[in-house]
């Protein structure tokens, strides 16, 4: 089964990390991605630019409305994702627990919808 691990964190919490802590987090994250890839469970991953670069698009009555920023006002914002292959939800949750960003934020795990 395929699962997406959505990585959320508070921007202030991340910006308060020291350069050494940021470097360690980057190193740990890349190493974990490589570990998942070696085990055949990694599909894709990406970190996202800050929320200030976000644009929101809605189409109503056939007309697009584009606004700056995210749709909702929340403390934690989407920072990235890891798309994985797991045997079941329990394995996906175990994988999510190992994501280094889980130490600084929240990982939301959702199964892919199979239109099959």
Where are these regions (language model features)?
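Conserved, structured core segments of small domains
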Residues: 1-116
